[in-house]
Amino acid sequence: MADGHRYMQQSFSTPLPTQFASNNNLATGLLLNSLLNQFIADPSAAQQQAAAQANPAHSSATQINRGMYGQNHPQGHNPRLNGAAPGRQPNMPMFYNHVPQQGHPHQGHNAHHQVLQAGHSGHGARNDLMSHSTFSSGIMGNASPYTTNNLQNGHSVAARGGPAEQPANEHWQKQMRLKEESDRAHSAMTEQHQPHYYARLKAPENKGIGGSLTAGGANASGDSEEEVRRRPYQVEKRNRRQDWHNLDMSGQGLRALSSALFSYDFLVELYIASNRLTFLPAEIGKLRHLKILEASNNLLSELPPEIGMCTSLEKLLLFDNQIRDLPYELGSLYKLDILGIEGNPINPGLREEIVERGTKSLINSLLEQAPVPLPPSPRKPIVVQEDVSPSLERIKVMTWNILCDKFATTNMYGYTPTGALSWEYRKERILQEIRDRDVDMLCLQEIATDVFRDFFSPELAQNDYKGVHWPRPKAKTMNEKDAAAVDGCAIFYKGSKWILLDKQLIDYANIAINRPDMKNQHDIFNRVMPKDNIGIICFFESRRTGARVIVANTHLAWEPTLADVKLVQTAILMENITKYAEKYVRWQPLKDKRGIQIPQSVSVESDIPKPEMPEPGPSQEYRSNTDIPLIVCGDYNSTQESSVYELLSMGRVTPEQSDFGGHQYGNFTRDGVAHPFSMRSAYVHLNGTPDELSFTNYVPGFQEVIDYIWYSTNTLEVVELLGPPDQNHLKRVPGFPNYHFPADHIQIMAEFVIKQRKGEKVKVIHGSGGGASGQQQQQQQLEGGQDFGSGSK
């Protein structure tokens, strides 16, 4: 039998194997039934079961007969021709390990099918795609009919996700379903010569006929509420440059991608499958909004590290390429739901991870196992003005949103390794950065009460710093433990150089609801009152020169939908700065600066020597509130196009300002908002230069300047600024924080000199009354230990 045909080829006189030939009536009935079944649908499962129970012998014979005539095997025939109902292909096994005898492709080996179907379950739903001619021809006569070396598509069984006997899990089933879709698209573009398969698939959607045909497409839900919680601007609105967001370049035979493609940074979906691409350019990292990248059926052997910049990716399909390894930067793709790698000679360890535990687990493994990257080049100081008189008073100021620990979650910052995101690591990096900068005035946002009290205050005291801190007002309604974790704002200052004269908390919501012109406005209660943002105002005097300066620090609302609230908060801040500046003009001079010393707790146990006290100078006199040097720092969550920036830089906002949005805020919306100070952002001096600061907040999807150091131009002059971060380093950094940048904001720093007032000499004020002892006691209350951990007097 091995050398001859098992069945008659020219006649139907013996249509069945010899074991059924004795029953001619049964054989004839079976043959007729088989022929008719080629033109009618199969009976339902219930009918088949009933027939089997009524006549077991007939059922068994029917199964054998159908196997003989190819009713239930995957040889490439259309299922309708084999008698199957449209869309129904039950129990369609695949012949991966079996090589049939030449010339007899229709023989069935059902026991073998079951094993192979389990080993390659992903193809089980599309058995009709298998090539009949390839499978049944070109086989040597002496080939073993049970070879297991290779599957029909050229892959070994071991390369298809493990032993064939083990059923695929849900992760791998999803992988194989997408692989089949990719195969179908590739077949249509190469065999049927129909390129742009995905554009054709989405044609109804593009015409507005139906919804998205592809899961996870442009119409898929965007970022979660938690992911955008602290993003100060709507990314989708800002980057809407076109009415289209998808591009299909598949099936074109492309060998390289033009660099012009990557200028379309608004793309959400990019299809470059079924080409001849051997690499992806590093510019792929510019497509920061990309959610789907289909690059299957190419000749890719590796992925560029810059692929990690595409943190919006949800689906990355790389089926049937030549990729052996994956870059660690792929771990930054924390939103990736599916990584299609089937058909690649991928590293066995990576393959096992994705097969057993899925894409999310593989991405997280790459993220956590990645080595710490090399540090960036240090940020350079940029001299703005040279030849500054050494006799002028200098003030170095830094502001920094340090990212409160309770906000640093893996959901929010999934692209950051847990080691770099932990507070224990970040707080040490922040502390070291503060010490290295050695500024006179330090303004911090998002600093919790316990962090201020238990960590920064005692640590920075060793470096001659004293501090003032207030938490958000909601801390008043909490128990002591919960209140300690509430973040707020802080101002640290060098105690050997500056004396704290006064400090004030600006509670925006409380002030707004108690204003006579606003307390009856519904918008105040509905929009402003729920936000518990604050500001701090401190009044200092220089020990050496007697110059006085006002330093304010604030953190405004973050929501992009609350532009009106941010404007109201800024207006309240400037209104109170104006009010307190008028009070500070009349502030009594200090009579005995020598008696106002740094508390002994600052330097008793420190290895750093106690700083020498300068020879004190007399307190200076100011005629108006605008004469006092003013510095206003903070995280404003507002860009240069905002009304907040307009108010601070121009000094006025009209009632017609669009950011008010039709809401009513008393005098602010009736008369407009104004302040008397001439103010400028310190970093304006770098605009238009190679060192221009392009961001202060750096996270995926948002890189903008929203932190500022404002100063009064009539009293202060910028002499030096801290330059931007290393741009080359950022080409592979999707967002902060990371091992080298411990917060999602960067620190900005400016050094000022206090201008000498024209035509006026420094006046020595000889105060009268109120002995020195009482004044010293007042200063000790302001600057003493009770300031550490509490902003209230």
From Swiss-Prot:
UniProt: Mg(2+) binding residues: 446
Region listing for Disordered, in residue ranges: 50-85, 208-239, 764-793
Compositional bias per record (Basic and acidic residues), positions renumbered to this chain: 227-239
Start and stop residues of the LRR repeats: 241-264, 266-287, 289-310, 312-334, 335-354
Catalytic activity, reaction form: Exonucleolytic cleavage of poly(A) to 5'-AMP
Cofactor: Mg(2+)
GO cellular component terms, A-Z: CCR4-NOT core complex; nucleus; P-body
Pfam entry (one): Exo_endo_phos
Subcellular location(s) per record: Cytoplasm; Nucleus
Keywords, alphabetical: Cytoplasm, Exonuclease, Hydrolase, Leucine-rich repeat, Magnesium, Metal-binding, Nuclease, Nucleus, Repeat, RNA-binding, Transcription, Transcription regulation
InterPro entries: CCR4/nocturin_mRNA_transcr, Endo/exonu/phosph_ase_sf, Endo/exonuclease/phosphatase, Leu-rich_rpt, Leu-rich_rpt_typical-subtyp, LRR_dom_sf
General function of this protein: Acts as a catalytic component of the CCR4-NOT core complex, which in the nucleus seems to be a general transcription factor, and in the cytoplasm the major mRNA deadenylase involved in mRNA turnover. Ccr4 has 3'-5' RNase activity with a strong preference for polyadenylated substrates and also low exonuclease activity towards single-stranded DNA.
Protein name (record): CCR4-Not complex 3'-5'-exoribonuclease subunit Ccr4
Name of the encoding gene: ccr4
